[in-house]
């Protein structure tokens, strides 16, 4: 059985990693995440670390994962909030998953403007069609928090 340690991180260049996470990372061999995640955490990785970029098509990434019994994955914010942990659970249902979440960007926004997070309708356009956003607008949802990507931005 494969084990995935999925660590949620922020976009901050100065990452706060708990002692438990730093210890896990120092003992790790195989790491994965997006290019941006690698830029943010490379200084914490062991010198002989193997890095697997998370890129599309994901089948290629998961083929590389098959070679390793333990993988430490860095993901944005809360890995279960429209995140990569959901993909791992869907593609590898028998894998053991240990999560270390942090705040996601919409939680950070809500905290900054003192908005109770549960009052916000949240949706993701990351790699998804516009349908959910269109539906929220048609329903007249008052507060909509939207996760975007490089293709679906507030300007598009």
Language-model segments: residues:
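Beta-strand/loop-alpha-helix module characteristic of Rossmann-like adenine-cofactor folds
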Residues: 2, 7, 107-156
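Class I S-adenosyl-L-methionine
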Residues: 1-100, 107-108, 130
